Regions:
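Catalytic cores of NTP-dependent nucleotidyl/adenyl transfer enzymes across multiple folds
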Residues: 100-265
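Intrinsically disordered, compositionally biased, charge-dense segments
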Residues: 1, 5, 258-289
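Active-site nucleotide-donor binding segment shared across nucleotidyl transfer reactions
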Residues: 24-64
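Residue-level detector of alpha-helical secondary structure
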Residues: 21, 28, 67, 211-214, ...
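Well-ordered, non-membrane alpha-helical segments in soluble/globular domains
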Residues: 15-24, 64-70, 133-143
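Conserved catalytic core of two-metal-ion nucleotidyltransferases
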Residues: 71-120
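Short secondary-structure junctions
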Residues: 31-40, 66-86, 153-161, 165-167
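Helical scaffold of the NTase/Pol beta-like nucleotidyltransferase catalytic core
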Residues: 1-39
Length: 289
């Protein structure tokens, strides 16, 4: 076995949905832990998956022994050091006739991600192809944007760069859940002004169940958290128009969203707004004339 430092494992490719269970079953028997029911994201929901992320409920002190066990398994061909345990394994029942846009190699990357499986399934949830046109990351960015706007209380006093001296708001955390925080700028060590960093103090018990998260954010149910589309429909139903627009504008300006591509419906709405404003301006000119 070779050990690599982070990044994608060499020689791996997508796995077909029919190959996921046979591949994980082999590892389950050796590791004696449930892998199939702890897959994350879009694994098992789409025809092909680029890799397999699995939630691993394990104590931090037990991770070295788990890694040693993986190293001893012939099924683990390569391993990489990262914040997760990255491995390369052979795809069981590999069907070469099933192809996708990326090359299939007969091997797949499986990432073991230590943490709370229940919460990780909520955070890394990804809708199926029939439920959304967009990647699961859009859903998480939308939730994070909602957290930045909904029930946000900023102090009137600001620092030189425009940040409020204190802000109480929601935050979408991959480790802690939905948390209510008090955010303050971090002062420079010399006492002269502030750094670009913020200090986030959790002021309420973290929320980790989907229904409770939806309720805290003023939505109807866990189903509202399913996808970008369901979240957009939910905020349009439950929030004031000005807040909805602020959330959608913030979402569309997100760098990752722009890199992937702003959703078509937001482009259309923005064009309609521009045309409406242009029409209002034209009418104003006519009235002056």
């Amino acid at each position: 076995m070779k050990l690599f430092e982070g990044g994608a494992m060499p020689g791996v490719g997508p796995i077909h949905i029919d190959e996921i269970k046979p591949t994980l079953s082999v590892l389950e028997k050796k590791l004696e832990i449930d892998l199939i029911n702890n897959v994350l994201g879009s694994v098992g929901k789409k025809e092909f998956s680029g890799d397999i992320d699995v939630a691993l409920q394990i104590k931090p002190d037990d991770i070295p022994a788990f890694v040693d066990k993986l190293k001893m398994m012939p099924e683990i061909l390569d391993m990489a050091k990262s914040s997760v345990i990255m491995t390369k394994v052979k795809i069981e029942n590999f069907d070469q006739s099933k192809t996708t846009s990326k090359p299939r190699t007969g091997y797949v990357q499986i990432d073991f991600m230590p943490g709370d499986p229940g919460w990780m399934k909520t955070y890394y949830h990804s809708p199926s192809d029939t439920e959304s046109k967009y990647k699961g990351v859009f859903r998480n960015i939308m939730i994070a944007t909602i957290c930045a706007v909904y029930q946000r209380n900023d102090s009137e006093e600001t620092i030189d760069d425009g940040r409020p001296v204190e802000s109480e708001r929601w935050m979408w955390s991959p480790t802690d859940g939905l948390v209510r925080i008090k955010r303050t700028p971090v002062a420079k060590k010399n006492g002269e002004g502030y750094t670009k960093k913020n200090n986030n103090e959790i002021v309420q018990e973290p929320i980790k169940t989907a229904d409770a998260i939806a309720k805290a954010l003023g939505l109807d149910s866990a189903e509202d958290l399913n996808s970008y589309e369901s979240l957009k429909a939910a905020i349009e139903k439950n929030y004031e128009p000005a807040m909805v627009q602020k959330i959608l504008d913030g979402f569309a300006k997100n760098g990752q969203v722009q890199d992937i591509g702003v959703p078509d419906d937001l482009k259309t709405e923005e064009l309609d707004r521009i045309q409406e404003l242009a029409g209002m301006s034209l009418n104003s000119v006519r009235m002056i004339c």
